[in-house]
Amino acid sequence: MAEQLRFDGQVVVVTGAGGGLGKAYCLFFGSRGASVVVNDLGASFKGEGNSTKAADVVVNEIKAAGGKAVANYDSVENGDKIIETAIKEFGRIDILINNAGILRDISFKNMKDEDWDLIFKVHVKGSYKTARAAWPYFRKQKFGRVINTASAAGLFGNFGQANYSAAKLGMVGFTETLAKEGLKYNIISNVIAPIAASRMTETVMPPDLLALMKPEWVVPLVAVLVHKNNTSETGSIFEVGGGHVAKLRWERSSGLLLKADESYTPGAIIKKWDQVTDFSNPQYPTGPNDFLALLEESLKLGPNDPGEKVDFKGRVALVTGGGAGIGRAYCLAFARAGASVVVNDLVNPDDVVNEIKKMGGKAVGAKFSAEDGDAVVKAAIDAFGRVDIVVNNAGILRDKAFHNMDDSLWDPVMNVHARGTYKVTKAAWPYFLKQKYGRVLNTTSTSGIYGNFGQANYSAAKCAILGFSRAIALEGAKYNIYVNTIAPNAGTAMTKTILPEELVQAFKPDYVAPLVLALCSDKVPKKPTGGLYEVGSGWCGQTRWQRSGGHGFPVDVPLTPEEVVKHWNDIVTFDSRADHPEKASDSIEKIMANMENRVGEGKSGAAENEHLAAIKKFTGVEGKGTEYTFTERDVCLYNLGIGAKRTDIKYIFEGNEDFEVVPTFGVIPPFNTEMPFSFDDIVPNFSPMMLLHGEQYLEVRKYPIPTSGRLVSKGKLLEVVDKGSAAIVKQGITTFNAETGEELFYNEMTVFLRGCGGFGGQKKPADRGASTAANKPPARSPDAVVEVQTTEEQAAIYRLSGDYNPLHVDPAFAKVGGFKVPILHGLCSFGIAGKAVYEKYGKFKNIKVRFAGTVNPGQTLVTEMWKEGNKVVFQTKVKETGKLAISGAAAELA
């Protein structure tokens, strides 16, 4: 048996420890020999009120079990007093767990300064104050352990949490810097993104999911990270909850390198955009790219193809910090491209304004601090009547080693960078919403992304800006407001203080501006919002998260730190199981996939053989028929459900001589067909919540399709593929006319079952011709494009054709699945796309799609079609996000 991890003789400080995760930390460390400082203000999850009771209850519980503990009731912004309690009571401080937090969730358009400031006071400044107070003791004793707390909302952004997302991602940059500064003193710092029930989350998680999100699933990971045995895992980011533990790291694309001269234009970048986002040969960095080497390579290249000119005529661009350096370069570039420019600078905007006017452009100055965002934006409105583009560039440096950092260095950096970015964007937001157009370009830095010595304040602020950007990108997408973030490498007034002059000259701001203009244009071809890009010296690349495959622990057995240690390599190794999460629901999905991982229900080798035997038994065996009766009313309802309008008489009026049903209706009759097998028979750990509809294939075996009648569908199992952590099940269903016996439709449905693999089944799916064809779109512009805007009621109408899954109508159920709102049925998107193909090219004998992403009712579906002989290859995108909803799709014409 593994030796128990103990904390005897050590002192642990836990903030926000009156309940939930904080309480679980305290009880654990108290039981493992540590002396515990239980800090809790006793406020509500919104940060209101205070009470000493919560901390006292936890202290008494620890003492009753024979442990040592003391309560502290200070707010975390008085972190020095919290650490003082540890020193006075126990004489030392070894481990600091910054867990205190509040929520002030509200849509960005309705957010008030108080909502922003309170979140930052508790999450960001509180973590800084406690860590700063503990740091001298850590350095002196050459031992310290820090855990800071981020969240999925911080890592990916989340609706209604612009403040919280910013604060939580700020913790990542802060932690990375502490890790770098502390390493030589054996001060280990890590950050976790926990999914755990607490006073905060009880208002936003359904009760059944809350029950599975016990804080006890988080504590063992933290125990391993703060134990004295951990001397190397530092500056790391972990996702944890519900038995799932994984590590995240930054992944940087190989990017696009162009010649850094006057031919380096926005159009040149856009023309080769695929290279910007090419992750085929990625880097896994802990700091900036080698820009000197890139600059040398860039200068060897020939002139760039300028591509399509980016035109900003009629647009108003506001640039903060626009009076010098990189901000000046932005202002001049926008002016040259036809924009009216608002030059914001606290010191001197006038020189740049005059420079623009001298070259025939339009510009006004706005001499305000970025913190006075209302005044900055008012200057744009007063001068030009509108604002279209905001580039948040203003910044200051107050660098100092963390042990010398104080509030006079921390607060100004946080105020100018994070709060200034929030204030200017917030002031512009109502205008963006009204005109249904806005472009925001925010500025992080490699210090924020990766941390940097002497820049704990700057790193936290810059990473917070990225979290803020990701959250408002989600909120703005439906209003055509795009938000992106760059980490520029250029010589500026700020960097002059830390770079030699010759390097400052080499890293011209002119080599950053083209990407800024590209991102603020309407020309970015894929995923035009929510991106993070590094740029400089003629190079630009995208940076994203990579997540390890991690390890899933059984949810019916208490998790211990010793068990975490046993599986540590699985948790931290980035192998073929690694993926690239993009949204908060990607965290929930991993945790939900682990919910059926139970020792008590585990399958032995014999049981696995039972699954294989069941697959063999049921494959190809046809089930008894399931009847489906439909009328012209059902035809009208289906057509309306996939987007038919009141003007489409032949789809909605049974009295029309051309009355018909769209051929994709063929997926409806077999929908509830009784199959001759159950999923429990053929795969382990089956749960309906783990089922994803992967692909759909439909053959229309007889035209014209009747508009009423009695049909019978018979189904059979075609194959089961074992993907290790999941299973793929393919079913075939034939639909007959009950009166004549004629075959009308044949469907193949492919479902993906998370957590149901590993039973020793076949590893690769069979080639089944048209139903499994890859259908890669040709490398040319589409031959036809059809846009259909869905309504917010689309799913509510479509479900009446037979798919009553509450995921598509019940907000509470959708939230359990990790979605902000009920999503559109995949087969509804299939119908909309199939209708586009049918109306453009006529009858098809078969149609196949792969479901590549979700669609929210109200979003616009864009179907792009390429005719290749008798085959129409197509794909369907969500216009508002640029993401694919349907891929690998084609229809063979009849």
Curated annotation (Swiss-Prot):
Region (Short-chain dehydrogenase like 2): 311-523
Repeat recorded as keyword: yes
One GO MF term: isomerase activity
Enzyme Commission number(s): 4.2.1.119, 1.1.1.n12
One Pfam family from the record: MFE-2_hydrat-2_N
Role, per record: Second trifunctional enzyme acting on the beta-oxidation pathway for fatty acids, possessing hydratase-dehydrogenase-epimerase activities. Converts trans-2-enoyl-CoA via D-3-hydroxyacyl-CoA to 3-ketoacyl-CoA.
Domain remark text: Contains two SDR domains.
This protein's name: Peroxisomal hydratase-dehydrogenase-epimerase
Annotated source species: Neurospora crassa (strain ATCC 24698 / 74-OR23-1A / CBS 708.71 / DSM 1257 / FGSC 987)
Protein's gene: fox-2
